Design a protein with these regions (language model features):
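"A position-specific structural signal for the A-helix of alpha-solenoid helical repeats
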Residues: 7, 41-44, 74-76, 81
């Protein structure tokens, strides 16, 4: 079962409202920290809303938690973002 605010963040991203989605992902992280899906959502929302510092923070945390051997597409995206920003 996914946290409600994480799901709301996902819906807001689908509606192209990343700044609002970021707030929901951050609220979800307060209650259920270090969820892979929530961290990735927060990093994407931050990047799409132009908040590079938060995007870097969440992408870095995602990589730290998942480990260097993780090859999921989200991790490749995180590494690319950090390499170029």
């Amino acid at each position: 079962m996914l946290p409600a605010r994480e799901l709301l963040g996902d819906m807001l991203m689908e509606l192209k409202r990343p700044a609002e989605a970021l707030k929901e992902y951050e609220a979800s992280q307060q209650r259920e920290p270090n969820r892979y899906r929530g961290l990735y959502g927060a990093s994407q929302a931050a990047a799409q809303s132009g908040d590079r510092d938060k995007a870097r923070h969440y992408f870095s945390k995602l990589i730290e938690l998942a480990g260097s051997g993780d090859v999921r597409p989200e991790m490749e995206n995180a590494r690319r973002y950090l390499a170029s920003n």
